[in-house]
Amino acid sequence: MTLGTSFSLGDQYSRGLACTQMAESEAEGRSAAQPKILVVDDERLLADTTAAILSRAGFIAKIAYDGFEALEMMASFHPDYLLTDVMMPAMNGAELAIATTKMYPTTKIMLFSGQAGISEILEKSKIEGFEFQLLAKPVHPSKLVEGLKSLGNR
C-alpha cells in the first residue's frame, strides 16, 4: 500500500526535455549572427517591453533590473551592447556604463532616461573621461533600433 501522492514524468517529460534541448541548440546556432544586448532598467515593465522590442528586431536580449545584477550577468552573457537607464537606485546607469567600459571595453553602450536632471551625472562621467550616447524616454522602437545600429557602426 502506498501512502501519499505519486506521479510519473514519463514520455511527456522526455519529449519536453528534447524540445528544450533542440531549441537551445538552434538558439546557439543563431547567436553567432545576432548581436547580444543587455537591457537594464529598474522599471520592470519598461525593461521587459524594451527587451521584447529588441528581440523582434534581431537582438538576443537579456534583462537586468539594477546595475549590480547587470554586472553579474555580463560575466556569462558577454553582451555586444548595453542599454541602461540612467536613474536607478544603488548604482546609476553612468556608473554601470563606466564599470562596463573598464571591464568589457568592446561593449557598446547607450544610456536612456526619461528624467530631467541627469546632466550632472553625465558631466561627472565626462570629467572622468567617459562619454556615452543618450536617448530620451519615451523612445519610438524604430529610433531605439536605429540608434543602436548606428552605435554598432562606430
Label the predicted regions.
Residues G58-Y65, M73, L135:
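Short hydrophobic/Thr-rich beta-strand motif most characteristic of the beta2 strand and flanking loop
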Residues F112-G114:
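Hydrophobic/aromatic residues positioned on beta-strands within the core alpha/beta folds
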Residues A75-F77, T100-T107, I127-G129:
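Conserved phosphotransfer cores of two-component systems
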Residues M88:
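Receiver (REC) domain active-site loop signature in two-component systems and cognate sites
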Residues F77-L83, M110:
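Active-site beta3 strand of CheY-like receiver
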Residues M1-K36, H140-R154:
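Non-catalytic signal-transmission and effector/linker regions of two-component phosphorelay proteins
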Residues D48-R56:
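Charged docking surfaces used in two-component/phosphorelay signaling
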Residues Y65-E69, N92-L96:
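Acidic catalytic/metal-coordinating carboxylates
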